[in-house]
Amino acid sequence: MSWQAYVDEHLMCEIEGHHLASAAILGHGGTVWAQSADFPQFKPEEITGIMKDFDEPGHLAPTGMFVAAAKYMVIQGEPGAVTRGKKGAGGITIKKTGQALVVGIYDEPMTPGQCNMVVERLGDYLMKQGL
């Protein structure tokens, strides 16, 4: 299966009648492996900050997490594995695997729990595949 198929079929899938606003799979250095059509472009320093938060949980909490210059308030996650952010009626979930970052961005009416489920399920699958 291609990386694009993972995004199209597993991240942008319908969940209880709703879809993510955008999604992508990136390498740890920020290289885009596959993305939805309207996924925002990360700046290199944003990826650096996110990766540092995985290595040093809580690093982004004081400043927030930035994605394409949009600021997300960092909310609960799983240290070293999942970072979550909230911005208005939407938010973001990022799951770190051995080689990739699985990213989902949502807006209402999709819920944070639905976004978490979609992103983390694919991330867990990729980890089991050694990725």
From Swiss-Prot:
Motif Involved in PIP2 interaction, chain ranges: 81-97
Keyword Cytoplasm attached: yes
Subunit note: Occurs in many kinds of cells as a complex with monomeric actin in a 1:1 ratio.
Modified residues annotated as Phosphothreonine in this record: 111
Membrane spanning residue stretches: none
Entry GO terms, CC: cell cortex; cytoskeleton
Localization annotation: Cytoplasm, Cytoskeleton
Name the record gives this protein: Profilin-6
Similarity comment: family membership: Belongs to the profilin family.
Pfam families: Profilin
Additional observations: The variability of the residues taking part of IgE-binding epitopes might be responsible of the difference in cross-reactivity among olive pollen cultivars, and between distantly related pollen species, leading to a variable range of allergy reactions among atopic patients.
Record keyword Transferase present: no
Function comment: Binds to actin and affects the structure of the cytoskeleton. At high concentrations, profilin prevents the polymerization of actin, whereas it enhances it at low concentrations.
GO molecular function: actin monomer binding
SUPFAM superfamilies named in the record: Profilin (actin-binding protein) (SSF55770)
PANTHER family linked to this entry: PROFILIN
Domain of life, per lineage: Eukaryota
Annotated organism of origin: Olea europaea
Biological classification of the source: Eukaryota, Viridiplantae, Streptophyta, Embryophyta, Tracheophyta
Cysteine disulfide links: 13-115
Post-translational modification comment from the UniProt entry: Phosphorylated by MAP kinases.
Keywords annotated in UniProt: Actin-binding, Allergen, Cytoplasm, Cytoskeleton, Disulfide bond, Phosphoprotein
